[in-house]
A protein has these predicted regions:
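Extended, low-complexity, turn-rich repeat/linker tracts enriched in Gly/Pro/Ser/Thr and Asp/Glu
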Residues: 79-88, 142
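C-terminal edge strands of extracellular/lumenal beta-sandwich accessory domains
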Residues: 23-49, 54-67, 93-107, 124-167
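Beta-sandwich interaction modules
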Residues: 118-124
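Short, charged juxtamembrane terminal tails flanking transmembrane helices
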Residues: 191-194
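Bacterial N-terminal signal peptides
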Residues: 10-16
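Bacterial N-terminal signal peptides that target proteins for export
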Residues: 1-8, 172
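A short, hydrophobic C-terminal helix/tail in secreted or cell-surface proteins
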Residues: 170-188
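Sec/Tat signal peptide C-region and signal peptidase I cleavage site
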Residues: 18-22
């Protein structure tokens, strides 16, 4: 019975520690005429064809990994493009490599308007040990301007690491539970010793 209590306390501690690391990771950029261009894909899971509208869109690429297998959210939160629909973003997530000359190769999922308004959102399962690339672009050619977005953990307790560096500090609410978990572990050990 004591071993079961110790195991339960250790499991609780593990869950609390993982939850403490699952913080949103913001990103921000700006699409400009001087950026590289490519023929983006159509939306899909996975995308199956190239766009006939977004044939020469500027893009930014965010390389990232995850620290635990789980479900992760990638989304644009705002955009202020100076032509076309002001917030019409388009995102694609790739695994292993992104090659703008072969935009369908390694494309896992692409989204146009699943976020609010014309913003983009992808939620998908990702695994540790894989390099991923989020490509942020516009729906139409020659749409330039700033945008913001974020990565977030949905399930799994892992953290998104953008460009090889942790993106955010642990959540304060989860860290406040850590002393409670440690106290429970100490109490179970004290009872088992008696």
């Amino acid at each position: 019975m004591n071993a079961l209590r110790t195991f339960a306390a250790a499991s609780l501690l593990s869950v609390v520690a993982q939850a403490a690391l699952a913080a949103p990771v913001p990103f921000a950029g700006s699409l400009a005429a001087a950026d590289p261009i490519y023929n983006r894909t159509l939306a899909g899971n996975p995308p199956g064809a190239l766009s006939a509208v977004g044939t020469a869109v500027s893009y930014d690429v965010y390389g990232f990994t995850v620290t635990a297998n789980g479900s992760y959210l990638m989304e644009t939160l705002s955009a202020a493009f100076i032509s076309g629909t002001a917030d019409d973003t388009f995102i694609t997530v790739y695994q292993n490599i992104f090659n703008p000359l072969a935009p369908l190769t390694n494309a896992l999922q692409a989204d146009d308007d699943n976020g609010p308004g014309a913003l983009s959102t992808i939620t998908r399962s990702l695994n540790t040990g894989v390099n991923y690339f989020l490509v942020v672009t516009s729906f139409d050619n020659r749409q330039f301007g700033p945008y913001t977005g974020r990565f977030d953990t949905v399930t799994g307790g892992g953290q998104v690491i953008v460009g090889g560096a942790p993106g955010a500090l642990p959540e304060p609410s989860a860290l406040m539970l850590l002393p409670l978990a440690l106290a429970g572990l100490a109490l179970s050990r004290k009872r088992s010793a008696a």
